[in-house]
């Protein structure tokens, strides 16, 4: 009887191992179809459930000059995925009573002249429902290449109109997240980067993530690339593409290793409370098909996170990052304790098509 039970257990284990190998092979096919040249710009991919690795692969080059290969220690520009870190900072300050998410922008920016800033709250800027238009001077090439979180929002001082009443619609806009840089500094008296390092990154156990500065050394730095008209790869990041210097909305460089630490800190409530997490993962506004950025069926926006609810599927919480040649997906399924990280140094890919294929392979 005991021998029979052992034989059954062994057979079941073998079947599970065989299934895991098949799943990994199917996922490999998806990524190998895109990253099929080891000497071209590449990507890092990690899928974990709990502490178990479902899939982990690195492809291609992080730097085409030095020929450094992509690894899980490679620091990618995660672009707009940076927004969730800034949102967590504001929620920490709300937890401490330093500010309220219902505080109006006029409390922190008395220099903003229009009366409607009294009606726009921190909740609105974190959920992309403020109505503030993106009126940055994009025709000024020097501005878009080298502006920072302060200069990028100067147009709001004399802004005289909104695109819609706050809280009534969704419009994805980077400058409202850039405001968080000054809100943190004005509310705490602490430089933004210092606050983030001590209260967010260190608490999460993140070791090498850094905000971009032109003269700052970042270990294992990846570069983004695009193909030129001759089909050759050329670098396309700072100096070639806009707004690499704005920190609160998009200038964080982070590795897969550090992002796993971040996800664990979010899951285990080490950087926020469970109540704050529920707020962040709540879809405050549904994204309509005519939205310029972020629409997917069944998707809304929380605080720094897209939240997708589809019939017969578990809820997906994620964000996208796009800047220069970098194309980033940082997603999770909280109820399954599953994370899916896909960081790429090239943009010529169908990112969400790839993501959806992988979720389908995983029956998610």
What spans do the regions from the language model cover?
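Short, conserved catalytic-motif segment at the N-terminal edge
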Residues: 19-76, 100
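Bacterial Sec-dependent N-terminal signal peptides
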Residues: 1-18
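A short acidic/small-residue loop/turn micro-motif
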Residues: 60-64, 243, 347-349
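Active-site SXXK
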Residues: 31, 45, 51, 75-102, ...
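Short, surface-exposed loop or secondary-structure junction motifs
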Residues: 63, 117-320
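Short, glycine/proline-biased beta-turn/loop segments that scaffold the active-site neighborhood
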Residues: 100-115
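Short, well-ordered beta-strand elements
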Residues: 316-319, 328-332, 336-346
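Short, gly/Ser/Thr-rich active-site loops of penicillin-recognizing serine hydrolases
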Residues: 285-290, 343-364
């Amino acid at each position: 009887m005991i021998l029979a039970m052992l034989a059954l257990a062994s057979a079941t284990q073998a079947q599970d191992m065989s299934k895991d190998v098949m799943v990994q092979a199917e996922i490999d096919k998806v990524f190998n179809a895109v990253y099929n040249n080891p000497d071209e710009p590449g990507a890092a991919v990690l899928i974990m459930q709990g502490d178990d690795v479902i899939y982990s692969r690195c492809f291609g080059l992080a730097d085409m000059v030095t020929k450094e290969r992509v690894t899980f220690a490679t620091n990618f520009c995660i672009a707009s995925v940076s927004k969730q870190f800034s949102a967590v900072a504001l929620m920490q300050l709300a937890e401490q009573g330093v500010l309220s998410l219902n505080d109006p922008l006029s409390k922190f920016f008395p220099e903003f002249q229009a009366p409607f800033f009294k009606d726009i709250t921190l909740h609105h800027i974190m959920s992309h429902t403020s109505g503030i238009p993106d009126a940055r001077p994009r025709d000024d090439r020097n501005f878009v290449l080298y502006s920072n979180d302060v200069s990028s929002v100067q147009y709001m001082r004399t802004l005289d109109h909104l695109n819609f009443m706050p809280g009534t619609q969704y419009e994805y806009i980077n400058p409202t997240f850039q405001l968080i840089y000054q809100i943190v500094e004005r509310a705490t008296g602490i430089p933004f980067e210092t606050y983030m390092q001590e209260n967010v990154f260190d608490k999460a156990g993140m070791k090498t993530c850094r905000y971009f500065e032109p003269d700052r050394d970042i270990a294992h730095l990846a570069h983004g690339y695009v193909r030129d008209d001759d089909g050759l790869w050329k670098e396309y990041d700072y100096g070639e593409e806009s707004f690499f210097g704005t920190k609160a909305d998009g200038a964080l460089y982070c590795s897969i290793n550090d992002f796993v630490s971040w996800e664990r800190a979010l899951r285990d409530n080490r950087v926020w409370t469970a109540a704050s997490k529920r707020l962040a993962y709540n879809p405050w506004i549904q994204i309509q098909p005519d939205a310029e950025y972020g629409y997917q069926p069944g998707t809304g926006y929380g605080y720094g996170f897209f939240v997708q609810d589809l019939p017969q599927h578990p809820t997906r919480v994620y964000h996208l990052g796009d800047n220069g040649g970098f194309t980033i997906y940082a997603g999770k399924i909280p109820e399954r304790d599953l994370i899916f990280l896909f960081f790429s140094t090239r943009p010529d890919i169908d990112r969400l098509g790839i993501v959806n294929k992988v979720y389908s392979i995983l029956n998610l």
